[in-house]
Amino acid sequence: MGPRGLQLLAVLLALGLCAPAGAQKPSACQCSRIEASHRKNCGFPGISASECFNTGCCFDSRVPNVPWCFHPLPKQESEQCVMEVAARKNCGYPGISPQECASRNCCFSDTIRNVPWCFFPILNQDCHY
C-alpha cells in the first residue's frame, strides 16, 4: 500500500473511532430546548447535517457564531422531562424519592448535584426542530 493509501486508511480509522457505535439521532426536544449560547461543539468546520446526526448530535445552522453541530441534552424517560438544568422548577423537597416525585406527576433525575431532582415537566408542544 502506497503513502496515499496509508493516509486514507488513517483518516478512515480516525473517523471510525470518533463516531459512537450505533449513534442515534437525538429527539427534537433534546436539540431545540438547549440555548444557543450553551451549545457544546460536536463536529468540525463544514460538517453536514447528516454527518452530524450520524454521530448522535444536533444540527442547526440558523444561529451565527455558535456551534452548528452540538451535543444534545441528555435523554430522559419522558420527552416532557428533557430540559436544561437552569429550566428546572422544583416539584419536590430535598431527599424526595423517585416514586414520590412520580406520584406528583413530575420528572426525576438525580445525576446533577445542587439542582432540583424532582421538577415539573414541560409540554412537548414547544419542541420544534
UniProtKB/Swiss-Prot annotation:
One Gene Ontology biological process: chemokine-mediated signaling pathway
UniProt cross-references to Gene3D superfamilies, sorted A to Z: Spasmolytic Protein, domain 1
Positions where Pyrrolidone carboxylic acid occurs in the chain: Q24
SMART domains attached to this UniProt entry: PD
One Gene Ontology MF term: CXCR4 chemokine receptor binding
Domain of life: Eukaryota
UniProt keyword list: Disulfide bond, Pyrrolidone carboxylic acid, Repeat, Secreted, Signal
Subcellular localization(s) per the UniProt record: Secreted
Pfam families named in the record: Trefoil
Signal peptide: 1-23
Disulfide-linked positions: C29-C127, C31-C58, C42-C57, C52-C69, C81-C107, C91-C106, C101-C118
GO annotation, cellular component aspect: extracellular space
Domain P-type: start-end pairs: 29-73, 79-122
InterPro entries found in the cross-reference section: P_trefoil_chordata (IPR017994), P_trefoil_CS (IPR017957), P_trefoil_dom (IPR000519), P_trefoil_dom_sf (IPR044913)
Function: Inhibits gastrointestinal motility and gastric acid secretion. Could function as a structural component of gastric mucus, possibly by stabilizing glycoproteins in the mucus gel through interactions with carbohydrate side chains.
UniProt cross-references to PANTHER family, sorted A to Z: INTESTINAL TREFOIL FACTOR-RELATED, TREFOIL FACTOR 2
Protein name stated in the entry: Trefoil factor 2
UniProt source species: Canis lupus familiaris
Encoding gene (name): TFF2
